[in-house]
Amino acid sequence: MSNSCHQCSHCHNQLCLHKVPIFNGLNHEDMLKISDLIQHKTYKKGESIFSLGDNLDSIVIINVGSVKAYKYTPEGREQIIYLFSEGDFFGEQYLLSKRKAAFTVEALEMVNVCMLSKEHFQALLLQYPDMGVKIIEELGSRMFRLEHFMESMGVRNIDLRINTLLLDYSEKFGSKVEEGILIRLPLSREGMANYLGIARETISRKLSQLESDGIIRSISNKAIIILDITSLEEGNEGVL
């Protein structure tokens, strides 16, 4: 855990809880009880929330910002496994076992998180069994997304990999605007290239081609608008 964290001064416990699906269904009184158990911390861009091999003692909820979960391949290349953003949680699987962290989680920007200790988390699972069911559902959803990603990585056609990534981003990080879907990209071009296992120059060239084709429009290095999401979806049909 980073030693440079400090108390979050502008987020509220209940706000964190309402963003997380596993707490859905709890009444106001229960929410207040749980909110008293939560600790807030802030991490700067580039700081690690935890590292590969750490013993974890808390479930972490993203209140503001986004993080990447990654590890290095035997060749020394960074491989991003998950991206977590507002309302997502992680670390729960390690609180239910004695395993150490299988990846490092690093802030992609200024991040505010809410932390619930292992002891409190386990007590809540006993008190609210529905939480356990929702955690299993979330883990299943993550496994499905990971399998979908691995399937797309097995496709040699780089265009299809990039299409899949943009479609995933539109669902997780996109917001509707007049022209289409605005995506605040969580990763740089280099990060996206690492995620897909391709060269940075390749993804820059392919994104430029999509822009020339009128499918996307680049706003900045950190934002694009998908103008024609149907073309991306049709490009993936019958492949994944």
Report each predicted region and the residues it spans.
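Cyclic nucleotide-binding regulatory module and flanking cytosolic helices
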Residues: 1-45, 90, 94-96
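N-terminal positioning helix adjacent to the helix-turn-helix/winged-helix DNA-binding module
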Residues: 154, 158-161, 165, 188
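A generic structural signal for short hydrophobic patches within well-formed alpha-helices
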Residues: 31, 121-122, 232
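Phosphate-/nucleic-acid-contacting segments
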Residues: 171-240
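Short helix-to-loop capping/linker segments positioned immediately adjacent to catalytic or ligand/cofactor-binding
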Residues: 122-126, 145-155, 175-176
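Cyclic-nucleotide recognition modules
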Residues: 82-144
